[in-house]
Amino acid sequence: MHKKIQDSSGGNYIPEVPLETTFDTGDIVLDIQGRADGIIHNIDGSLTVDEIKTTVEDLEKFKDENIVWHQGQAKMYAWMILRNSNGHTKSIKVRVSYYKQGHIKDKLIVEEDFTFDELDRFANDLIHEFIARLKEKGQHNLSRNKSIDFLEFPYKEYRPGQQDLIAFSDRILLEESKGYVEAPTGIGKTVCVLYPFIKNFKEGKTSKIFYLTSKNSIKRQALKTVDALVKEGADLRCVAITAKETICMNDEGFKKHCNPDECPFAKDYYSKIYKVIRQALSEKNIFDEDDIKEIAMKNTICPFQLSLDLAVNSDICIYDYNYVFDPVVGNPEIMDSNLPLPYTLLVDEAHNLPSRAIEMYSARLDREFFMNVYTELTGRKTSKLKSAIVDIISWFDMRKSDKDIEILTEVPDDFITLLKGFQEEGLNLEKKPDAKYPDSYVSLKSAVKGFLKLPLKGKENYSYDITYYDGKADAIHIFCLDASEYIRDISDRFNATLFFSATLSPVDYYISLLGGTKDDEVNKLLNLPSPFERRNRLVMVDSIPSLRYADRNISLPRVLNSIYQMVREKNGNYFLYFPSYEYMLMAYERFEGLGEFVCIKQERNMTPSERIRFLDEFEEDPLRTHLGFLVLGGVFGEGIELKPHALNGVVIVSTGIPGIGYDNDRLKQYYAGKGLNGFDYAYTYPGFNKVIQAAGRVIRNVDDKGVILFIDSRFGHSNYRKLLDEVYPDRIYVSSPQEVREETMKFWKERS
């Protein structure tokens, strides 16, 4: 609409004028740039700066609420023009032109004359306020650096391996390179990577630490670690970023309407935020989700944007992976940078990043998604958007096949054209006064944007297909087979990067998926052994029962007997992991029917609070044995917060390999084409990671004791024996439920 207004403004109206000036305060030089919507050369020789604003609100109301900062923007442009004229132009008109979206004749003009002296005072006040912010940040940096001069490790003693991890982290930062760390759960990895990186703030190797994790429990642990360092005297600012939809304080149905016309927390945001941040930073150093919500509610501002603005002023920022790696929602400063940034990157639970990155760089659009939005759009104003959606639905309906999947070499051009038409009509709808549209449209708009942002024509690491149901096309899919180049490219933009996890085995597999090289496996890898005594654990492998899908019903009684013989020998808490929800239910019903144990099962789609309540059931030394029935690879497979010494044992039923299917077979073919073992890359290794993560729930502290039982005939195969050698070289093989009982009885008797 801006262009339409500019084009209709006459020949003396010069649109989109770039402006620039330099301001030297003596110790700071600012290069100030902007682009005026328009400059008008009036008949009398005077100039007018025009700033165009559009809205769907009542123009008078919109003007009254926003004129101060709208006019302020135009006044800065006017000041630059007069300043650059070197005194030849003494005054200028400043105009703010308000237009109703989609109605060029419905307008409100606010115009005022200003002299250079008036504008110069205005600009100087703003500039000096901005410089004060810069200096405040500089003062904080000086205070921070001074405070870490004598910063001690925040705990009385180092655990085994911690000093090695600190030294390795320090080396990676000093070399400005990438490192990979495999260190067991319970060693205290978080403090060992943060401590040396924080100590290096003073050396100028980093100006900000990005700490990435996909788990809320690990986010809390990182905040707790920073808090411990602050209590040791470090003047650090830290903020944890929560997903926009999670932290949004609007009611359901309005969470995606992020504009000042509809959201009370977006209204007047930028006129409030500076004072809010100054006040917040004067009161505390560390901000979690609850802190941010409290500040946002008190000041009626957007909590998500507040967290991002606090991050600008923070030394340590804790994010989900998508904030750095997602091509759609990633931080623009990182995503758009071609140069190394003065930041460092810490990636926790790094074994999860490759699969998450594949999700970020893949997309799927379903016919049903478009159909649902079509039915929810109402009113005459939505007619053109609905028509665009009908065209897309028709595109699906015209494609027919007796196959389930049609392989493509690229996304069809006609489909891309239809998607762009959908985007255009959606934008037109949003500009209309009082336009109403459901959250489902906002979600679909985001999905289409993400789809079009991906490579649309054949790339070696991409696969394209259309799926069919009952002979009709029902979805189109862009599938990223390998995201390692994107992980490598983005992590290259940081001054130094450390990937760390309790599970990076097999090492060659994970380092390659994280964008590393063969050389990295030798020179940039730290593999720390477990600091916990092996005598405190019993690791058994029952490799007799077949857990292949076709054999599961037959082997179920044998599997359940082995589990029973293990859990009956010591009163306590046990987690039992199964290959599917259906299989888990069968096991749960059998054990529940015995009446001997307290049986608690994982439910489908549990909320965060329901998960916490589930875990709270497992207290140390319960009166009756508690059995937790869980799905292998599910929400309780890793990154959970259990009470100390909560578990006495874990049983893992199956090797955890994903179901044989088209997507995984494509991965298999892709890696086979690169000369690697395709089956291992697509099936064995992802499944084995689930197994090891689940097994790691037991021994988490020096004085923990427990039993681990793996059940699946495939654990007896040579490839799994080799994988288990890297993690559990002390395991024993058992051939019957009776042997499980005897070994378990002996273990607990020796440790009673």
Language-model segments: which ranges?
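Conserved pre-motif I regulatory segment
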Residues: 140-182
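Conserved helicase motor "Helicase C" RecA-like lobe of SF1/SF2 P-loop NTPases
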Residues: 579-603
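Signature of the SF2 helicase/ATPase Hel1-core->accessory helical subdomain module
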Residues: 220, 224, 297-423, 502-516, ...
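Mg2+/Mn2+-dependent nuclease catalytic core
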Residues: 21-123
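Conserved RecA-like P-loop NTPase helicase motor core
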Residues: 532, 543-554, 604-716
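A substrate-engagement module of RecA-like helicase motors
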Residues: 145-148, 152, 205-317, 325, ...
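A contiguous, basic/glycine-rich beta-loop/short-helix subdomain that forms a polymer-engagement track
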Residues: 292-312, 317, 328-335, 427-546, ...
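Walker A/P-loop
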Residues: 174-196
